[in-house]
């Protein structure tokens, strides 16, 4: 590990590796990522990996579309599988108000170039044969949505970053960050200090701790989410074994 880099990325999850990948793609090859344990050992490893294109914001929607497009070509670029499944996404509406929201979104989707369909209960039943559609008004269907394996994606981004000149060091905990009078930054680790122009924190659950190293109190806290794993469902098992396409994400 060198003692001087242009940029130091702190955190080895999907955000950190993506940032390093894109820095190197932009010509900042003299960049390094530091991870205190192993890649994906934070919140990335147990993320659901869903890729929702739906967003009412034009700017965020563009990022979503870019991400989905990137994930589909990343395996070809790096040779590292990302386990991308383009099985689509169904957003169900039980009220006319919800369908109106989806119609408002259609303008954003059309501007960004995101394929979508506003469909009724009969079409929902065709896409999801096991759905009870009696109380549904309709749905927003994104055929290009799907899901990805977060760990595989992280490894592909890391490989892509290395292919473009980036460096990654695991088991390298950042213990301090300070700024010099000439505006350079010094990042302290158990393996020694690194001087750089820019430090980017991608530490997820540890964002507050990282912020405190530079005198910032970031209003970031971990939030509990539900992740339910069911037992085998005979109808779905028969459907999958019958060679049918993967059902859309609901």
What kind of region is each of these model predictions?
Residues 140-198, 202, 206:
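Helical element adjacent to the flavin cofactor pocket in flavoenzyme catalytic cores
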Residues 49-127, 247:
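Dinucleotide-binding Rossmann-like beta1-alpha1 core, especially the glycine-rich loop
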Residues 97, 128-136, 178-186:
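A short, glycine/Asx- and small/polar-enriched loop/turn
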Residues 20, 24-25, 160:
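Gly/Ala-rich phosphate-binding loop of Rossmann-like dinucleotide-binding domains
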Residues 35, 120-121, 170-172:
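Short loop/edge segments at beta-strand edges and connector loops
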Residues 24-45:
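Glycine-rich FAD pyrophosphate-binding loop
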Residues 18, 177-250:
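Flavin-dependent oxidoreductases
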Residues 1-15, 32:
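Beta1/beta-strand and adjacent pyrophosphate-binding region of the FAD-binding site
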């Amino acid at each position: 590990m060198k003692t001087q880099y242009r940029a130091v990325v702190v955190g080895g999850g999907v955000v950190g590796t993506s940032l390093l990948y894109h820095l190197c793609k932009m010509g900042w090859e003299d960049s390094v990522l530091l991870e205190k344990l192993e890649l994906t050992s934070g919140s990335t490893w147990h993320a659901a990996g869903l890729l929702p294109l739906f967003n009412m914001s034009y700017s965020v929607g563009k990022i979503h579309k870019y991400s989905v497009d990137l994930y589909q070509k990343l395996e070809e670029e790096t040779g590292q599988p990302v386990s991308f499944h383009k099985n689509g996404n169904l957003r169900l509406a039980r009220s006319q108000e919800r369908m109106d929201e989806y119609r408002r979104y259609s303008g954003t989707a059309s501007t960004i170039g995101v394929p979508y369909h506003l469909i009724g209960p009969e079409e929902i039943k065709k896409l999801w044969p096991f759905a009870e559609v009696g109380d549904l008004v309709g749905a927003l269907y994104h055929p290009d949505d799907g899901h990805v394996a977060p760990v595989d994606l992280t490894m592909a981004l890391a490989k892509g970053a290395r292919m473009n000149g980036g460096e990654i060091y695991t088991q390298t905990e950042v213990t301090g960050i300070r700024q010099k009078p000439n505006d350079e930054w010094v990042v302290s680790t158990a393996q020694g200090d690194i001087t750089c122009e820019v430090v980017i924190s991608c530490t997820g659950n540890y964002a507050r701790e990282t912020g405190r190293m530079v005198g910032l109190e970031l209003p970031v806290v971990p939030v509990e989410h539900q992740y339910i794993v069911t037992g085998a469902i005979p109808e779905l098992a028969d459907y999958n074994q019958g060679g049918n396409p993967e059902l859309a994400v609901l």
